[in-house]
């Protein structure tokens, strides 16, 4: 379970693209297509890392991250926000909600995979 990544994004093309690149690097992937499902899966499955879109139906990524941190304060699950937003205020909101990192769309998949590996290595869960 040390390589399980939850991808939470309502854009199915982004999900397929990210999932493919992570699987090619040996990661297992689970997917949520809205914020509520993302929170439920994060709490139920306990992924090693979460890639979280900021703008999703039912609950935005900031709220998902904040609720996850509130409901599981002991869980040290790294959260990387994926977003089309590039304003500093948005980045600040992400970090305030408890995010560990930020990637702006469009992104280089090699950079994203590298960030995933770095955060898992920092957590001691990368294989």
Task: List each language-model region with its residue ranges.
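Short hydrophobic/Thr-rich beta-strand motif most characteristic of the beta2 strand and flanking loop
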Residues: 26-33, 41
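C-terminal output helix
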Residues: 107-116
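Active-site beta3 strand of CheY-like receiver
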Residues: 45-51
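Receiver (REC) domain active-site loop signature in two-component systems and cognate sites
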Residues: 56
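Charged docking surfaces used in two-component/phosphorelay signaling
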Residues: 16-24
């Amino acid at each position: 379970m040390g390589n399980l990544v939850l991808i939470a994004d309502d854009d199915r093309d982004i999900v397929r693209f990210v999932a493919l690149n992570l699987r090619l690097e040996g990661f297992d992937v689970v997917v949520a297509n809205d914020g509520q499902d993302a929170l439920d899966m994060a709490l139920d499955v306990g992924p090693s890392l979460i890639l979280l879109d900021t703008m999703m139906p039912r609950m935005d990524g900031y709220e998902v991250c904040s609720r996850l941190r509130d409901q599981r304060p002991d869980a040290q699950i790294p959260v990387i926000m994926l977003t089309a937003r590039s304003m500093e205020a948005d980045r600040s909101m992400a970090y305030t909600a408890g995010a560990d990192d930020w990637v702006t769309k469009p992104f280089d998949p090699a950079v994203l995979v590298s960030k995933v590996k770095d955060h898992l290595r920092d957590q001691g869960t990368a294989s």
